[in-house]
């Protein structure tokens, strides 16, 4: 069974990597789905970078 953590974001560039690191430190294998609601900061760029580096990270941009 896979577990997916869904993380809604809106202008969270300062927090995305922090929460990602905390989730990654768990011993549970998780998929991570960021759902961004048209952030005006660099949130989407950070999310794209993470998704390229880690195969368990995906995103939806609205």
Per-region residue spans from a language model:
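Cell-envelope/extracellular polymer assembly enzymes that use nucleotide-activated donors
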Residues: 2-4, 31
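Onset of an N-terminal alpha helix
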Residues: 10-13, 40
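Short, well-formed alpha-helical segments that are part of the catalytic scaffolds
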Residues: 12-26, 46
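A short, compositionally biased N-terminal segment around positions ~18-40 that is enriched
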Residues: 28-34
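Conserved donor nucleotide-binding strand/loop of the catalytic core
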Residues: 30, 44-62
């Amino acid at each position: 069974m896979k577990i997916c953590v869904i993380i809604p974001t809106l202008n969270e560039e300062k927090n995305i990597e922090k929460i990602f690191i905390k989730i990654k430190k768990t011993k549970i294998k998780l998929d991570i789905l960021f759902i961004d609601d048209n952030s005006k900061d660099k949130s989407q760029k950070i999310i794209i970078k993470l998704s390229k580096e880690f195969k368990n990270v995906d995103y939806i941009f609205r």
